[in-house]
Amino acid sequence: MANLTGKVALITGAGGKHGVGRAIALKLGEQGASVIVNDIVSQPYPDRSAESEGLPQVVRELCALGTGGIAAVADITDAAQVQELVDKGVEEFGQIDILVANAGSRPGKDRLPVVDLDEEAWDLVQKTNVKGTFLCCRAVARHMVERDEGGKIIIISSVAGKMGIPRYAAYCASKFALIGLTQSLAHELAPNRINVNAICPGLVDTERVDHMAAALTDPGETPEDRRTRMIGETASTTPLGRVAQGADIADVASFLASGESDYLTGISISVSGGMWMG
């Protein structure tokens, strides 16, 4: 088990009840890291489970583990807010050793064939997934370079960043871009002992699947039916026979955040149960 005692992690997009960001935050907290959890809102979105209290709940869970945790609301597509986010983390804990750039766009009007895709929907996906990740990486990398103690940057891409999928053109393009960003940053930051790697999940059973199901529902089909069908079809075509849980992604993130990954940089690890083996 990795030991992250004394390390400080910033995780974006960590406010969901069953989300990947929350799972990673708690995993790193279990391993001793102090964690800054970020989302665009403090409380859950209206359609999220009433059982979730967003960032405050994640912080309470981190504190229950005996590690430090703070919440920081910020829009990652705004450079000034991103800088304030990083500054808040450094002010509270003195440093940031690990960035997990997890925040991404919610599925919606972008889930259409290219010929029907609205320019505004395209731009929103690129702004959130690509620009937002770039701004977070830039701000944290500047801090890490200045501090000169190395660091770990983990970018959450997707298997959709390795293969095209019908009706996912905007999303695929953004996730392909993140793999390119990962590799470029890995080259640039290697002299500073900063490792930069990407995780490429397949379908993960989180609130995001609810949004995807609502966006992809066929005529005569309810979002709940579509969700069940998506989970079932994906599991049946995945060699390991199931879709991912947030913990599956968190386990890989904890490895990449630790010293055990010191000789890895610029790689994109598919965490898809064998759905994608490239």
Residue ranges and their predicted role:
Residues 2-37:
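Canonical Rossmann dinucleotide-binding motif of NAD(H)/NADP(H)-dependent dehydrogenases/reductases
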Residues 49-56, 83, 105-123, 146, ...:
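Conserved mid-core segment of classical short-chain dehydrogenase/reductases
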Residues 115-134, 154, 178:
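Catalytic Tyr-X3-Lys loop
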Residues 142, 146, 187-191, 262:
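Alpha-helical segment proximal to the catalytic Tyr-Lys
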Residues 111, 163, 236, 240-242, ...:
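Short C-terminal tail/terminal secondary-structure segment
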Residues 52, 72-85, 119, 246-248:
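The beta1-alpha1 cofactor-binding region of Rossmann-like NAD(H)/NADP(H)-dependent oxidoreductases
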Residues 137, 174, 182:
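Active-site helix of classical SDR
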Residues 158:
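Residue(s) in the substrate-gating loop at a strand-loop-helix junction
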